[in-house]
Amino acid sequence: MASEAKESPANNPGLSTVRDEATKGYIMQQTMFRVKDPKASLDFYSRVLGMSLLKRLDFSEMKFSLYFLGYEDTSTAPTDPTERTVWTFGRPATIELTHNWGTESDPEFKGYHNGNSEPRGFGHIGVTVDDVHKACERFEQLGVEFVKKPHDGKMKNIAFIKDPDGYWIEIFDLKTIGTTAGNAA
């Protein structure tokens, strides 16, 4: 007799398998990072990771800006500002960079907590690439800081890099992730 899948309700107390009709149109839309310097962060997410800037919102009264980035073709995005905002908020899996004005030039500013030191909390985001080893060779040439390279540690073929604010980004590919995570499957 086959055992229950790890993803089954029997193996996951609290898991609801009945999707409420009210949640039918929900998507995971964004993860927000606070950033010290938008110039450094925009360079990293666009040039290093290949994301596009989907929308920028400036809140001058509150002195902060939001930058939404993702893996979208912006050539067909609306040009009307309101329509572009709605379009952006309809894209799945975007990164929202929040910049509180002045942090980039404030010598007293100590930076933000990335969640990977005590007290631990948020861990990382993940980016799928075509080939984890080739991507990491490129990242190395670009001077990206690594937490873990694909050949390090017990879990091979995955890497962790840091963005300019120290947030961790897991890098993996679909060719190897199944075997890398195979023992946990």
UniProtKB/Swiss-Prot annotation:
InterPro entries named in the record: Glyas_Bleomycin-R_OHBP_Dase, Glyas_Fos-R_dOase_dom, Glyoxalase_1, Glyoxalase_1_CS, VOC
GO biological process, one term: response to water deprivation
EC number of this enzyme: 4.4.1.5
Cofactor(s) for this UniProt protein: Zn(2+)
Domain of life, source organism: Eukaryota
EC class name: lyase
Catalytic activity line of the entry: (R)-S-lactoylglutathione = methylglyoxal + glutathione
Short name of one Pfam family: Glyoxalase
SUPFAM superfamilies in alphabetical order: Glyoxalase/Bleomycin resistance protein/Dihydroxybiphenyl dioxygenase
Region feature (Disordered): 1-21
Active-site residues (renumbered): E170
Annotated keywords: Lyase, Metal-binding, Zinc
UniProt binding sites for Zn(2+): Q30, E96, H124, E170
Pathway: Secondary metabolite metabolism; methylglyoxal degradation; (R)-lactate from methylglyoxal: step 1/2
Family: Belongs to the glyoxalase I family.
Domain (VOC) ranges: 27-174
A molecular function (GO) term: metal ion binding
Record's keyword annotation contains Zinc: yes
PROSITE patterns given in the database record: GLYOXALASE_I_1, GLYOXALASE_I_2, VOC
Role summary: Catalyzes the conversion of hemimercaptal, formed from methylglyoxal and glutathione, to S-lactoylglutathione.
Sites where the protein binds substrate: Q30, R34, N100, R120, H124, K154, M155
Name of the molecule in the record: Lactoylglutathione lyase
Cross-referenced PANTHER family: LACTOYLGLUTATHIONE LYASE, LACTOYLGLUTATHIONE LYASE GLYOXALASE I
NCBIfam families per record: glyox_I
